[in-house]
């Protein structure tokens, strides 16, 4: 008539839990990081598409081999993005920056630049 667990049984359970946590924790952490990366990429695509719509609807022009930017704040103000702000899932901070618009090979190309300092290198589309 035993009434409890022996020390060896308790240690065995602790070892099993430790082994499982060593296996499970990195897997869960990697899954979370991957989900954040995927969400970030989706946010970037949404911003680029909104920048493209803003550019097209505003009838702005970019000449061959010219580069101009439209700021995320301008896109938000003109309601091409439905949220009042877009949050970066990696940093939990608001996504700012701009969409860089290039015209070459007879086609427009759009790229999201996350830092305002990178945007200042280019002319604003409104100028």
Task: Show which residues each predicted segment covers.
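N-terminal single-pass transmembrane signal-anchor helix
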Residues: 2-28
């Amino acid at each position: 008539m035993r009434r409890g667990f022996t020390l060896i049984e308790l240690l065995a359970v602790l070892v099993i839990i430790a082994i499982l946590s060593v296996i499970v924790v990195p897997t869960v952490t990697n899954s979370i990081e991957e989900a954040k990366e995927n969400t970030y990429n989706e946010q970037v695509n949404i911003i680029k598409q909104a920048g493209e719509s803003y550019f097209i609807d505003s009838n702005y022009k970019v000449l061959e081999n010219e580069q101009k930017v439209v700021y995320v704040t301008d896109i938000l103000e003109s309601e091409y993005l439905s949220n009042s702000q877009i949050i970066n899932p990696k940093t939990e901070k608001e996504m700012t920056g701009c969409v860089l618009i290039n015209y070459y090979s007879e086609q427009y190309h759009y790229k999201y630049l996350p830092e305002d300092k990178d945007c200042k290198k280019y002319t604003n589309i409104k100028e």
